[in-house]
Amino acid sequence: VSLSSPTLYPLVSCEGALTDGNLVAMGCLARDFLPSSVTFSWSFKNNSEISSRTVRTFPVVKRGDKYMATSQVLVPSKDVLQGTEEYLVCKVQHSNSNRDLRVSFPVDSELPPNVSVFIPPRDSFSGSGTRKSRLICQATGFSPKQISVSWLRDGQKVESGVLTKPVEAETKGAGPATFSISSMLTITESDWLSQSLYTCRVDHRGIFFDKNVSMSSECSTTPSPGIQVFPIAPSFADTFLSKSARLICLVTDLTTYGSLNISWASHNGKALDTHMNITESHPNATFSAMGEASVCAEDWESGEQFTCTVTHADLPFPLKHTISKSREVAKHPPAVYVLPPAREQLVLRESATVTCLVKGFSPADVFVQWQQRGQPLSSDKYVTSAPAPEPQAPGLYFTHSTLTVTEEDWNSGETFTCVVGHEALPHMVTERTVDKSTEGEVGAEEEGFENLWTTASTFIVLFLLSLFYSTTVTLFKVK
C-alpha cells in the first residue's frame, strides 16, 4: 500500500460577526492521506501553542481508498481583536510527512478609516530650551486591521519624533469589528509658527488617506467634526520615577464645557479619582480638556485595562475608550555607550559635548537622564532625540542624548553619568560614566601603540645592520 500525505484546507465559520462577545471558530481540513493515523495541533502566529482544551478533533472518515479528518479551535474574539494575530497555524503530523497551514481570521467587511488630526493649542508648547508640543493623528472605524501611519513635513517624510501606538479594537456591541490607531509627532514651536505644512498619511489596503494641518488651520472656519477623545498611556519614565501611572484622557473640539464630565474606571468598574482641566478657548472657538487619574505602577504593568468615559450635552451617548499596557511588543534591553568630547572640539577650549548612544531596544519608550558627580542635571542642560527605528534591525529602536558642559569642568576631571531607563533592563535602569580619564585611556592606547611601533622599528633596523655586518665579515674571511 502506497503512503499518501495529507492535503490541508482552511475552514472559517460563516456565522455571526466578529465582536467582543463571541468566539471565533477556525478549522483545518486534512484530506487524501494514508494510512489513517493523523494528529492535529494549533499555535498562534508567534509559535506559542494553543491550549488543547479549546481544540476539538473529529473522527477520521474514509473517503474512497484514502482518509480525511477535521480539527476545530475556538478563540475568544476579544483576544483576536486586541492582539496582533492575523492567523493561526494548523499543524498536522502524519507518518508520511508533517504539514503546516496558515488559517487567517475572517474579515467581516472592508471599511475605510476616518482620519483626524488634533492641532496643539497655543499654550501647549513647553520646555525651558526648545519649546515643543505634539500633533496627534487618529484613524478610526476601519477594517481589516492592517494599516500604517506616517508623517510628512512640507511633503518630506519625517523620520524622528514619531510615536505610533499599536492598533486597537474599538469597543462596541453588535456589528462588524472595527479598529483604531493613533500616532503622535513631536514638533517645535518655531517650526509650527513658520507655517510648515504637516501631513498625517494613513495607508489602508494600499489606499492613502492624507490629512493636512498647519498653524493657519487654527483659524479655519471649517465646522468641527465633533468631540474627539484621545486616551494617552503613561510613559515609562513617569511610571518608573514616580512609581505610579498617570492616565490622561484628552478631549478636543468642545463647543462648550459646562456639561462636560470625564471619568476613569478600572476594569472592574471601580471609579478612579479623576482631575479635570479645561484649556482656554482656541482660535476656532472650541475648547480642549484633559481628565487625569493615577493608578499604581504595578496595576498598569500587569496589563489591567482602564476605561475613560466622556459625557457631554452634544453627545448622543457617552464615549468610552479603553487602554492597557501593550503586551504584543517584544522586549529587548538597550545597549548603552558613552562617548567623550571630540579632540577637535576640545582644541577650541570653549565647551565639551558628551554623547550617550542608546541602541537596540524595544519597545520604544525609554528615558535618558544625566548626572554630574552623581547629582541629576536639569533637563535643559542636555538634548535627547526621540526614539527612531534601527535601520538594520526591524522592531528595534535607538536614541542619543548630548550633554554640553564647560571646557573647564571637563578638564578638571568632573564625572558625568548617563542614566538610561527601560522596562527590558534587569533592574529597569542602567548607567555609564565618563570623565577626562576615559579620554586619556583612549589616548594612552594610541600613544602606547606608537611607542611599541617605534621600539619594534629600532630592533628591526639593528637586526638588519647586524646581519649586514656578519655577512661582510664572512666574505672578507673567505677571501
Swiss-Prot record:
It comes from the Eukaryota. Residues 1-106 are annotated as: CH1. The chain crosses the membrane at residues 459-476. Keywords: Cell membrane, Disulfide bond, Glycoprotein, Immunoglobulin domain, Membrane, Transmembrane, Transmembrane helix. GO terms for cellular component: extracellular space; plasma membrane. It is a single-pass membrane protein. Residues 223-327 are annotated as: CH3. Disulfide bonds join 28-90, 137-200, 249-308, 356-418. Residues 328-458 are annotated as: CH4. Glycans are attached at residues 46, 114, 212, 261, 277, 284. It is found in: Cell membrane. Gene3D superfamilies: Immunoglobulins. PANTHER family: TAPASIN. This is Ig mu chain C region membrane-bound form.
